From Swiss-Prot:
Organism (species): Saccharomyces cerevisiae (strain ATCC 204508 / S288c) (Baker's yeast)
Gene3D superfamilies: 3.30.420.40, Exopolyphosphatase. Domain 2
GO molecular function terms noted in the UniProt entry: phosphoprotein binding
Known role: Required for a novel path of interorganelle communication between mitochondria, peroxisomes and the nucleus, thereby maintaining a functional metabolic interaction between the tricarboxylic acid and glyoxylate cycles. In particular, required for the retrograde expression of the peroxisomal isoform of citrate synthase, CIT2.
Gene Ontology biological process terms from the UniProt entry: maintenance of DNA trinucleotide repeats; mitochondria-nucleus signaling pathway; positive regulation of transcription by RNA polymerase II; protein import into nucleus; protein localization to nucleus; regulation of transcription by RNA polymerase II
Origin superkingdom: Eukaryota
Miscellaneous: Present with 3260 molecules/cell in log phase SD medium.
Family designation: Belongs to the GppA/Ppx family.
Cross-referenced Pfam families: Ppx-GppA (PF02541), RTG2_C (PF23566)
Protein's name according to its UniProt entry: Retrograde regulation protein 2
One CC-aspect GO term: euchromatin
PANTHER family tied to this protein: EXOPOLYPHOSPHATASE, RETROGRADE REGULATION PROTEIN 2
Gene symbol of the encoding locus: RTG2
Length: 588
């Protein structure tokens, strides 16, 4: 971060931390101005974004003969005009001249008149164009995907206009490992669309399949990743590029009731969902459910034409690469990848959810978190709830305090899908759903029927991924910590925690649930009783130790504790997780 002096104005300080990036891609040119200030660099907040929907890839091919040709002069002129406009915008924001990067990829690199194009940009703006080599382009693309999530582990696939890139990636604690031999193949969405018009599609399918059989060997997947994939039912596939984002938007369009339709970054689907759609597009050569009257959100006419080609490509790839269990979609591109590549390890290691929620944290948020964690069995709670959702919940605990009472839980439910952290880069749909569910419970969870349906849809987002039993536990404990915070924030509503007002004590109960056994004895046959009565539940008793006479624990607070008992009892009903809330009053 820049050094401050007494003469610095706020505008000068902000401007010094801004950087401009121009991403000259195959299917469009993206302009952005981002902040690289250390306190929020991990989530790369943008102050300006724009895009020129100009395909440098397509303009290099004759529409009649498919012969390659130079980038037309009028297109170069149009690009230079857009560049000059962005230069003025950078001046308006105060972006230092040395903090603007112009980065070009495949479409520029392979252009017949690449030098003419680059010189024209320099002549009109004074900006030099960095043309990434093939390996650098893959590396930056991987960084873009890694920046889009908290952790990434699995295979990496980028489908651009002219080519595709395959690699593997592991990111954890700020370190990024990837293949030293990534493979690029000429099967981009635009390339395949042209070939499908002239080539035999069956032959093309087998060509891609064989090429990817070789490619998967060349990238050298580490044995530990192969072993883990065997245990877990397959690899996660992390994707980027316009062709695959188009597939993601199509799958969202087809998923009736899916609650996060407008954010593609962080969306995940099962292998079965993705594979079925790929096969349909390949075999039918059309998009299901699409018409002139019903266009797919964020899928342009040009992208829609390419989707059958993407379907053919993915159908072939899936027959060549190891088993995939889930497909993850990323919006991280050259902007995000180039910024992330420059971040120090300690900033890369930060959790995007905690960085996004930190500006809203009460002064003593650590005390709230400490008190919350005294109500949690640390050894059994899912890691995502304890390490990510609980701290973010404490950060956001009072952000809706000024809202009308009846609006608070509803606004909280939407906090990461339409609310104050919805625009944060780096959040999966699962994380967005969980923090909304937790924060809604923190405000009591009293929401109208339509919002109750939305809440259930958010739960389904969580249940779609991974092991179903573990996902159910994650949802359960997320609701639990939100309900506990409802009481904590009722006792301490001012963002300040006084010592010795109340605390929690957790004890484990691992015995067979007697009440469940009795219910089955009354209502079912003897055989069923035997099977069910031996089932053990994870049982805990949480005692709220509270001062009898403290003003902060008056009738209104005691009423919250009664509500807590009811809500946790309801949560525990029919669940493997069982928590009983007890109350112990003491005199000071």
């Amino acid at each position: 971060m820049s050094t401050l002096s007494d003469s610095d104005t706020e505008t000068e300080v902000v401007s010094r931390n801004l950087c401009g990036i121009v991403d000259i891609g195959s299917n469009g040119i993206r302009f952005s101005i981002s902040s690289k200030a250390a306190h929020h660099a991990r989530i790369m907040p943008c102050v300006f974004k724009d895009r020129v929907g100009l395909s440098l890839y397509e303009v290099q091919y004759n529409t009649h003969t498919n012969a390659k040709c130079p980038i037309p002069r009028d297109i170069i002129k149009e690009v230079c005009s857009a560049m000059k406009r962005f230069k003025l915008i950078c001046d308006d924001f105060g972006v230092p001249e040395t903090s603007v990067r112009v980065i070009a990829t495949e479409a520029t690199r392979d252009a017949i008149n690449a030098d003419e194009f680059v010189n024209a940009v320099y002549g009109s703006t004074g900006w030099k164009v960095e043309i990434l080599g093939q390996e650098d382009e893959t590396r930056v693309g991987i960084y873009g995907v890694v920046s889009s999530f908290n952790t990434v582990r699995g295979l990496y696939l980028d489908v651009a206009g002219g080519s595709t890139q395959l690699s593997w990636v592991i990111s954890s604690h700020g370190e990024v490992k990837q293949s030293s031999k990534p493979v690029s193949l000429p099967y981009g969405a635009g390339t395949l669309l042209r070939r499908m018009r002239t080539d035999d599609n069956r032959a093309l399918f087998y060509e891609i399949k064989e090429a990817y059989k070789d490619a998967i060997e060349k990238i050298g997947i580490p044995q530990e990743m192969i072993d883990d994939a065997k245990k877990e039912g397959g690899f996660d596939l992390w994707t980027r590029g316009g062709g695959l984002r188009g597939m993601g938007h199509l799958l969202l369009y087809q998923s009736e009731g899916y609650p996060i339709q407008t954010i593609i970054n962080g969306y995940a689907c099962t292998y079965e969902e993705f594979s079925s759609m790929s096969d349909y597009l390949f075999l039918k050569q059309k998009i299901p459910g699409s018409s002139k009257e019903h266009k797919i959100f964020k899928v342009s006419d040009r992208r829609a034409l390419q989707l059958p080609a993407v379907g053919l490509f993915m159908s072939a790839v899936f027959e060549a690469i190891p088993q995939i269990k889930a497909v993850h979609f990323s919006e991280g591109g050259v902007r995000e990848g180039s910024l992330y590549s420059l971040l120090p390890k300690e900033i890369r290691a930060q959790d995007p959810l905690l960085i996004a929620s930190r500006p809203y944290a009460p002064l003593l948020t650590e005390k709230y978190l400490y008190l919350l964690r005294t109500s949690i069995p640390q050894e059994d709670i899912p890691e995502i709830v304890n390490e990510r959702i609980a701290p973010a919940l404490c950060n956001l605990a009072f952000v809706h305090a000024s809202y009308p009472k009846e609006l608070q839980p509803t606004a909280a439910l939407h906090v990461a899908t339409r609310g104050i952290i919805a625009g944060c880069h780096g959040l999966s749909h699962r994380a967005r759903a969980l923090i909304g569910i937790a924060l809604c419970s923190r405000w009591g969870g009293n929401i109208p029927e339509s919002e109750e349906k939305y809440s259930q849809e958010l739960e389904q987002v969580v249940l779609r991924e991974g092991d179903k039993a573990e996902a159910l536990r994650i949802v359960w404990w997320t609701k639990y910590i939100g309900t506990i915070m409802y009481v904590i924030c009722g006792v301490h509503p001012g963002g300040n925690i006084r010592d010795n007002v109340f605390d929690f004590h957790v004890s484990k109960r691992s015995e067979v649930e007697t009440s469940l056994k009795e219910l089955i004895i009354d209502d079912a046959n003897t055989t069923k009783v035997k099977e069910e009565s031996t089932r053990k539940n994870r049982g805990y008793e949480v005692v709220v130790r509270i001062s009898k006479d403290d003003l902060k624990t008056s009738a209104s607070v005691r009423s919250r504790i009664i509500t807590l008992q009811k809500k946790v009892r309801k949560l525990s009903r029919g669940s493997v997780e069982r928590v009983k809330i007890g109350v112990q009053f003491y005199e000071e």
